[in-house]
Structure formats: structure tokens, C-alpha cells
């Protein structure tokens, strides 16, 4: 039976709203619900066995991401991809599992190529010694995780490295993209491209050299190292895709 209002205000209610929004978001991103197709609240409520309040909040979440729109007399309709907030971490996750997954991965790598070299240059010039040392520590943890062939450790260390890199730039606008970059890294690890390959040691070394350049205050070298790191990642993914790997 649908939950009552007290439950809707609780953690359980929020989880229900999240489940409905995520289920519909994945269907929209996969094309199961194409642009301009209607979404009927009553139908969704019956399908998920939730109240109108839960459905309404789930719809609000999707509308905030540009994926659906409610119009007077027209009802709620799926919006074209051009209307979606493609930088939203949830939208990135949902698209990653759909037909646009490969294209999105390449697009996000282009975004990283624009953001991370600039962040590296700023970070190297910042004089934020303590934060620079944190970046070097994250690079060291990345190396240990790769040596241990531990995907959870590797993922965590890589996320920490790139978060510190962008935060260390001191640029508030770049920092606004942290959620997007984190989602981009997640989509790379969940893309089907093998994580531990012959290129793993090279990638680990590139992270180390980038951290060293930043800690040394060499802005030119840091910018170049960051650009090389992202470009080599993109090349590896393309090569794996061409050879028959799944992205």
C-alpha cells in the first residue's frame, strides 16, 4: 500500500522518492521512454506502490534535471536529451548504462581535458603546500592500490586524487564541476573497459609525475602532465572499444 505522510517525510520516504526517480531516469536515458512520451502519475504510483506525494517529489527531481516537464492540460512529458542537465551526476550515471554511454564517456573526457590541466596549473602556482602534499599522498595510495589489484582502493584513491586536484586550484567555478568529474570517473570504472591492464602502471606513474610537478610548483609541467594523463586515458578507452571491449 502507498506510504503515509509521516513515512514520506522520513528517510524511508526519501529512499522511495529516490527509487522512483532513478527508475524513471534510467528508462528515459535508455530510450525506453522517448522524448514527448507521457508519464502518468497514477500509473507510476501503482507501479511502485507509492503515494502521490512520493511520485510528485520524484517528478520534481526529474524536472529539476530537465528530463521531464509538466504542462497545463498536456500532462507530464519526457523532454529531449538537449533539455537535460548533462552535467548532473545522476544524469551521467543513468546515461552511462544507456545507448549514449560510449559517447558520454568521450564527452566527459573532453570536459576533463579542459578542466584538469587548468586546475593543475593553478594548483602548482598556489603555494598550498599542505594540499599539494595531500595530492602526493593520494598518488602514492593509487600506486599501492594498483599493485594490490584492489579495484575499491583504486577507485577511492583516484577519486581523492582528482578531487584534491580540482579543489587545490582554488577556483570556485572549477570546484562546481567536482560532482561531474566524480561521476565521470565512476562511469569510466563502470564502463566495461578493463581496469588493470598493461597501461595501468603508466597511468599510475602519470598521476605520480603530475603530483610531483604540482608540489614542485612547476605550473607548465603540471598543466602538460594533466593533459597527457587525460588524453592517454581517452586513447586507452578508444583502443579497447575498437578491439572489441565494451564501453
Predicted regions and their residues:
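Short linear motifs at protein or domain termini
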Residues: 1-115, 121, 243-245
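C-terminal all-alpha effector/ligand-binding and dimerization domain
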Residues: 12, 139, 143, 148, ...
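Juxtamembrane/interface motifs at transmembrane-helix termini
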Residues: 19, 56-57, 128, 153-154, ...
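All-alpha effector-binding/dimerization core of bacterial HTH-type transcriptional repressors
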Residues: 83-164, 202-225
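Phosphate/oxyanion-binding loops and surfaces in catalytic or ligand/nucleic-acid-binding neighborhoods
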Residues: 118, 122, 171, 184
